[in-house]
Amino acid sequence: MTRGRVASITGAILLAGTVFAWNAVRQEREFRRLIAAGDAALTRDQTYEAIEAFSGALALKRDSMLAHLKRGDSYRRRGELTAALRDLREATALDPTATRALELLGDVNAAMGRYERAVELYRRYLAIDDRAPQILYKLGLAHYRSGQFTLAVDPVRKSIALDDRFSEAHYLLALCLKAQKHTPEAMASLGRALELNPALGVAREELAALDLAQGKTREGIEQLEALAALEPSRPERLINVGLAYARVGRTDAAVATLGRAAERYPQADVVYEALGRVWLASAEAHDDAVALSKAIQALEAAAARANASSDTLTLYGRALILSGRIQTAERVLQQATTVWPVEPTAFFHLADAAERRGHAAAASDALASYIALSDEEDKEQLTDRLAALSGRKR
């Protein structure tokens, strides 16, 4: 072979190598640009644009763990869990030691209700780094959501040992302890969670419920009042305060609290339903005509709304029966039985109204529906009454 030909071949090889190297550099630059563009889109919460950018990056590097991870996370943020699952599985297959991929894949499985798989993935993460309080918390949460309360306690305690200021972990520990009937310890954990984060509404709500269940009325109502102050946009928070007063017989305080709620949330039907409920209970307990009139006044407007709930209509029907307006009560209670979700006692009170009006067949049908829906253990009296109504309708 002549020297010229050798030189020519060598030059061609060098040129090809240069072109190849340049293309590789250009491809790497474009890959990095697309990754950066996807990250920037995510900071603006533009998940669709992020997915487009990361897909472009994957077109350049199909075996990029990073691009699969980022696209999977983008799908997760959009709620497209099946697509997220696919990408995150690929990311963990490409790099089994990538802890972020393991965490996100665990999160997606947990969001899909696949708690056993989530537990496995969080454990794989912890095998690499066993001092990650957030992952220990997620492991405990996955156990808790799958109903394995005992198994949940250990990882949550370890999470707290690593980060004692992790308020959500203290709250989760309280839920686990409550599920195991360890009420004093649960209340202590809730107290610690609120000490760390006074705005943690779910913990305050749980502590209020436990206080009230333990007969600590003052403490429970104080927690509910604090919750109402923390979440002023939610009328049900102040309603819960009023109903708590009513349950312990403090009708005046209940009415005053619900009156404040009515002033603050004049368009919220749930406020008037609660007021009607309190006044009706007082009317029934004390045969109080004034309380009955106020119950009807509170419930009438709420029941007239097109979207009135079955519960509201049932309360209104009960008040009408008590006031002697049986015909109107029957009509309202018939309507209550057609609204989903149905309040089962609507059928019981409809049977009462229909029977009073001499509509034995309608009363029998309503009572039969109530018996079918009711979870009362002793139904003997009800079945006896049903038999009597069935005999009268023949």
Role assignments for model-derived ranges:
Residues 60, 94, 128, 162, ...:
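Structural marker of alpha-solenoid helical repeat scaffolds
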Residues 31, 65-66, 99-100, 133-134, ...:
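Helix-start (N-cap) detector for alpha-helical repeat units in TPR-like alpha-solenoids
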Residues 356, 364-394:
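Terminal, low-structured helical/coil segments at or just beyond the last alpha-helical repeat
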Residues 45-53, 77-90, 100, 111-124, ...:
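Structural signature of tandem alpha-helical TPR/SEL1-like repeats
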